Structure formats: C-alpha cells, structure tokens
Regions:
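A positional/architectural concept
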Residues: 1-53
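Charge/polar-rich, low-complexity and marginally structured segments
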Residues: 49, 55-163
Length: 163
C-alpha cells in the first residue's frame, strides 16, 4: 500500500498520493498530478495494480536497460503503426514501452543512415515515449531531464549494438 506523500506513477504520469480515503468500506487513493495543474485522480486501492505503480528504483531502471540488449523489440506492422503502438502503450508497462522504443530507435537510426526521413507516425510515438521516459527517469533518479535523456540514449545505443 502506498503512503500519503509518496510519488507514484498513474498510467506512467507522475503523481503524489495526497490522501488515502476510507468511505463506506472502500479505500481509495487521491492522487495529485505533478505534471499538470489542477489534475487529480481517484484510484480504488483494490484497482491499484492496473494503472498505479511505484516509481522505479535505480536498480530496476538499470535492470530494464541491461535487458534491452536481449529484448527482441516489438514487431510493428508498417500498415498499422498506430494500432501496433497503442496496443503496447495501453498497459502502461515500462518494459514494453522500452521494447517499443528500442524498435523505433532502430527504425529511426536505419532511416537516418539510409538518408530517408523517419516515418511520421513512428516519429510521433518515438517522441511520446522518449518524453515520458525522460520525465520518469528524472523523478526516479533525482536528476535533470538532460541527464535522463543522455542515460536513455546511451541505454538505447548499448541495447541495439550487435554482439
């Protein structure tokens, strides 16, 4: 159970547990978004594992980054990029988000090396995932967004090197 004042991820958005309400036999977290003003959420405690998770520890982040090398990535059907990407993003699982980002990073790098432009729909998802992960890394590791971006880029580079 999370505690009042704790920073958590709700659908991979940073939020603070502002209150734990007990009413009519049910218990719910009242969350305040740390990313947008006047945005709050109510999450039943019994429902918390669906969309609510702890901020990842440094050890968890390192493990996720190390696992990138053996992660096969996500197969993206070129005629259904939105559908493929949304299916991965909806469960709000960091490991799957990193797996998709790895695939998009490989596609982006290949396009750049071939002198092509990165497909617009993939570029959009690459930006969304990168921004979200940089925000999470910055909060979890108490570092600047620039440091988090460099760390993420280094992990992607290392995770896509052929062994």
């Amino acid at each position: 159970m999370f505690q009042t004042g704790e920073i958590v991820l709700y659908r991979l958005i940073l939020a603070r547990v502002s209150e734990i309400q007990k009413e009519n036999g049910s218990v719910r977290y009242l969350l305040t978004s740390l990313e947008s003003d006047d945005c709050s959420y109510e999450v039943p405690v019994e429902n918390r594992l669906g969309h609510l998770q702890a901020l990842p520890s440094e050890a968890k982040i390192r493990t996720l980054f190390q696992d990138l090398a053996s992660d096969p990535g996500v197969r993206i059907a070129r005629n259904a990029v939105d559908r493929c990407c949304k299916a991965v993003l909806e469960p709000y699982a960091l490991k799957q988000w990193l797996s998709l980002l790895k695939t998009l990073y490989i596609d982006k790098t290949a396009a750049e090396m071939a002198g092509r432009t990165f497909v617009e729909s993939e570029k959009r998802y690459y930006g969304i995932i990168t921004e979200r992960l940089i925000t999470i890394l910055s909060a979890a590791l108490d570092q600047s967004p620039k440091q988090s971006e460099a760390m993420l880029n280094a992990a992607l580079e290392a995770g896509t090197q052929e062994g």
